[in-house]
Amino acid sequence: MKQLVVERNNPVPVIWDTPIPQPGPNEVLIKNYYSVVSSGTELASIESANKTVTDKLQDSSNISKGLDLLKKEGLGAVIEAVFPKNVLPLQLGYSSCGEVIQAGKNVKDFHVGDKVVSNGSHAEYVAVNQNLCSRIPDDTSEKEAAFTVLGSIALHGLRLSDTTLGSKIVVIGLGIVGQLVCRLAEAQGCEVIGVDPDEKRTLDRNNFYTSIDDAINDKSINSENVDAVIITAASSSNEPIEVATRIARNKAKIVVVGDIPLNISRNDFYYKELELVVSKSYGPGRYDKQYEVLGNDYPIEHVRWTENRNFSAFLQLLQTNQISLSDMITEEIDFIDAPSIYEKFESDDKPLSIVLRYELTNEPKLDFEKTDISTPSSNGKIKLGIIGAGNFASTTILPILRDLKRECEVIGVASSGGLSAEV
């Protein structure tokens, strides 16, 4: 299958041919129909993959980690950490939809042929835990359903704002997630003001402004009527949080969804008794192994809106036409052309969103075949087969074995993950 990845020290994403992943007991294998490019997160991944040693030294935490490693494991370990011999490429993408073509033995709620959304990457096939999938309702656009994971990020941030019918919300940053927050808040009956310096993102909306001062001058907001500020911008500047504290009313809530610094002024929060919340991705369950790997759900009476229930809620809004996303899709392109699109997000005329379209091919053959393999002729080397090619095996064990090529020979590697098996 084909998968979009970013390699270390290569600023242009590439498409790799990798084995189709094998779903685990709590996973489903999905043939992707569409996936949505999340420019902010994915460009950050590309930038991270291309950081030089000098760039990394700018982060004081890396220096501390290096000194600790030097004390514990010596100079060789530090050199290996800075200049690794074998580094897995980064997968891109996390909001897609497609069709279930195989289900793990513990999966009860999904069956072959189901149309589902997932947080799968930009790849022809993805293996995803059942708690990170949701069935697409009938009469729902699959193309719009592909936005569900991004929509759930927006929905979780909105839930954390504790706003209700009639609340006034200011959304700072009108990229994909910011636009989704605005639409969800309006569907909830809130009054929404959007702010983004990119004029193209504020056109055709009377309640969108290129600066907060424009909104104040237009008398859309003042420091007494803003119930919540949701920051969906990505910035290295402290300006978003400073603006939020300036415009929020007393006892208002500020929710940070985007990647921004939080150099906050205590006095700004003290005198207004402001509440600051940093939103974690799609909602409760995120990064919890029990939920995302082992497939254990949270009881609804204790956790009403898990990430999976957020997926379902967003899909229901699409099905009932309470929100529509067709006008948010700037471009739709074939997946095979995906490597060329990222430079568009760096241009002055950057698109709001791009949807990748996958070719609907015949089903792959997923059954294992038993093959007779003749014993290799002896050359005095120890023959090794590796089962499991995770991060530790790929970055530590396999490089060591390569250094021992006079003594041993790796004749095969098996892994449930297509990308790690290819590496």
PLM region spans:
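N-terminal Rossmann-like dinucleotide-binding module
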Residues: 364-423
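C-terminal capping/lid region of NAD(P)-dependent oxidoreductase domains
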Residues: 4, 188, 223, 255-258, ...
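Mid-domain Rossmann-like dinucleotide-binding core that forms the NAD(H)/NADP(H) cofactor-binding site
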Residues: 115, 141-213
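A glycine-/small-residue-rich N-terminal strand-loop-strand element
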Residues: 77-90, 95-119
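Conserved acidic E/D residue at the C-terminus of a beta-strand in Rossmann-like folds
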Residues: 196-197, 280, 412-417
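Short N-terminal strand-loop motif that marks the start
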Residues: 1-88, 120, 353, 357-371
